[in-house]
Amino acid sequence: MPSTPLSATVEALSEDAAQARHAELSRAIERANQLYYNEDAPELTDAEYDALRQELEAIEARFPALTGTTEASAGVGAKPSEKFAKVRHAVPMLSLGNAFADEDVDEFVARVRRFLNLPAEEAVAFTAEPKIDGLSLSLRYEAGRLVTAATRGDGEVGENVTANALTVDDIPETLSGEGIPEVLEVRGEIYLSHEDFAAINARQEAAGKPLFANPRNAAAGSLRQLDPAITASRPLRFFAYAWGEVSEPFTDTQSAVLERFRGWGLPVNPRTKLCRSAEEMIAHYRAIEAERAGLGYDIDGVVYKVDDLGFQRRLGFVSRAPRWALAHKFAAQEAITELLAIDINVGRTGSLNPLARLKPVTVGGVVVSNATLHNEGYVQGVGADGEPIREGRDIRVGDTVIVVRAGDVIPKVRDVVIEKRPADAVPYVFPDTCPACGSRAVRELNPRTKKLDAIRRCTGGLICPAQGVERLKHFVSRNGLDLEGFGQTYIEVLFEAGLVKQPADLFRLEFEPLKAAIVARREALSAQRRTEGEPAPKKPTKKKGEEEDKAIKNLLASLDARRTIPLNRFLFALGIPQIGESTAKALAKRFPDMPALMAALAAATREQAGRDWLELSALPRIGPGTRDRLFETLDPLPGEAMQDLSLGARLRGRLTPSQREAVLAHYGSEAEADAALERAASQRPGDAYRLFADDGEIGPVATDSLIQFFSEPHNDAAVRALLEEVGTEPLAATTSAAAFAGKTVVFTGSLEKMTRSEAKATAERLGAKVSGSVSAKTDLVVAGPGAGSKLKDAEKHGVKVVSEDDWLAMLAEA
């Protein structure tokens, strides 16, 4: 069965489901950005990351109110690290749109021509240059001298790495030549050659240090060193390809800019070509692809840019990318080798991640000995949608496998050479307990597909050491307990020192052990740097020590200030799957405190619905209402008594023709459908379960997740231990104002005096409902600059429209 197109999947989402999926995608993208840009340790392939981005943008296209409400939606890259001073880019460093097929390039050229409204006889020139797989860097020159070097960061704010950039031979400290603008921001890429990368890893291995996974990670890690001497010891290279702020125009085409750069002493890629058609662009792409292995450095595609800068200005930008540029990505590189073993790593969110141990093989110039196998379903030959992949071929130890490096970053096993499978190879059996903590590992019901998730997860939650640090970071985060001063570093220090293993431990901290852990971490880092031949950090001065003591006391004070917590924040902070902020708030509306909620959940657990009941509820044209009416009585109805029918057949006969069609399509035959209906009849949930599951703001998926979480004894014990240290309080009552209570409000355009999430929260606090679309039921539209189709919809339906200032004035009167 073909997979459902993305557009159809998004079209089927309700507003609440879209908001939940948008939040889920945003979290995944933000984590991927953090790993890629700040930790130089990406987990996703380019294709996997692009798929997340495409789905996020599709949801935002249908629900525009969600645009800009998360970091993933509003920006590119990741927040800059706390290790470096911040630099705000005068002109944001944006990302590029992607092309994966020749047809995408044809469409790009056609789209540019349509936007510019050019006659058929007028040609448009494009530059085509290799896309370097490195770290983006912005160099600010004033009066020809380098004054600041900054990483991309989140696109708006980057990290100040000036001292490190000055050690890179390719980066001139002073530009030379004629016509240099007074202010010139040069954008480019830091990278390592294959030869230099191999030499660095050889030195790492000789020193007993971890090897870098690839040249991109090594280049990024080298540039983002606190000690410039380390950066200077690594032979980093640089290519310039773009610009940010300039004090005055200095040419009128992209190709001329690159020539100027070259003349001023900045290195530019020699394989850049000027093309005048999509055919020429694709031909150059093919030529560079053929040369790729011999270039001596990593590239992952070709970037096309409209050459005429006047055209570039007219084309402008859309979302996070320019309309006038496109990145044409290369297909993955492949090799064949033997699968020696399958190891299981436990991820930071509890996922059991299979890792292939391979007979070493060279893929794209890099020796690969490990590769991802994604998840249990992938190993079994089943996709995320439950449909077969690789024609159903599973992956077994001893198999000959095809390994790919997608995007020149993460190797993965793509397929099995089934003809070479050993006779004694047996299917791999995934563990059903967590190798890190021994808790049950389960596959959850996917709320979108209504099928078992492809990923098996540890249920140990709060006590699993593999998840511990990330769970604790989530617990103290701004949307959790919002513990002031408790950054990621403190959590890592406390966890490694054994002082904090679960949330309750935070509230048992004392001054002396906390200080000792911080001092021990500092001394360990000093010893490590001395071992590596690097200068150790200076010992803190008396004044610095006093400031450190004060900071520790402030941490303890912030903990004491959180010993009474709103129930919704407490629930969200626990990090229970499927319990986001909205669901946590819904639960907090219905229960006064945590003990009351836990008692209700215990009763719900005893009356939980069975699998067939839940599966039936999710079928098209059935739903909870039809299901409940269907099972109101199991006794024969008038007209059924005279027929010698089984219970399942009687129940099937009560369905409408379209409902019967849906049931038969799902179960495959009347016999299977009747058997499932009979099983469902015996699996009906009790009232205690339905109190949660039938609630529109909670639902069966979140209910089952809550039950599963608290059914794990370790989690139940951890929450009870936490409740000995803190108390929960009811959700603050909604403040209703006559102007807003029960009203439906829509925000459109840019809000300049508050974020969209702030505006939404304020409206909801005053008793209003915030919607993503305008209809006849909408009461008020708040329109900022750039408002589009929603204004027309408001006029069509006669809905009142106010400005952001009007809205703020209304709030002041409420």
From Swiss-Prot:
Top-level taxonomic group: Bacteria
Domain BRCT: 735-814
Region (Disordered): 526-549
CDD domains per record: BRCT_DNA_ligase_like, LIGANc
Residues involved in Zn(2+) binding: C434, C437, C458, C464
SUPFAM superfamilies: BRCT domain, DNA ligase/mRNA capping enzyme, catalytic domain, Nucleic acid-binding proteins, RuvA domain 2-like
Residue stretches in coiled coil: none
GO terms of molecular function: DNA ligase (NAD+) activity; metal ion binding
InterPro entries xref list: BRCT_dom, BRCT_dom_sf, DisA/LigA_HHH, DNA_ligase, DNA_ligase_AS, DNA_ligase_CS, DNAligase_adenylation, DNAligase_N
Top enzyme category: ligase
Residues binding NAD(+), per UniProt: D46, A47, E48, Y49, D50, S95, L96, E129, R152, E189, K305, K329
Entry annotation: catalytic residues: K131 (n6-amp-lysine intermediate)
The enzyme's E.C. designation: 6.5.1.2
GO CC aspect terms: cytosol
Cofactor: Mg(2+); Mn(2+)
GO BP term, example: DNA replication
Annotated Pfam families: BRCT, DNA_ligase_aden, DNA_ligase_OB, DNA_ligase_ZBD, HHH_2
Catalytic function, reaction form: NAD(+) + (deoxyribonucleotide)n-3'-hydroxyl + 5'-phospho-(deoxyribonucleotide)m = (deoxyribonucleotide)n+m + AMP + beta-nicotinamide D-nucleotide
Keywords attached to this entry: DNA damage, DNA repair, DNA replication, Ligase, Magnesium, Manganese, Metal-binding, NAD, Zinc
Protein's job: DNA ligase that catalyzes the formation of phosphodiester linkages between 5'-phosphoryl and 3'-hydroxyl groups in double-stranded DNA using NAD as a coenzyme and as the energy source for the reaction. It is essential for DNA replication and repair of damaged DNA.
Protein family per UniProt: Belongs to the NAD-dependent DNA ligase family. LigA subfamily.
Protein's UniProt name: DNA ligase
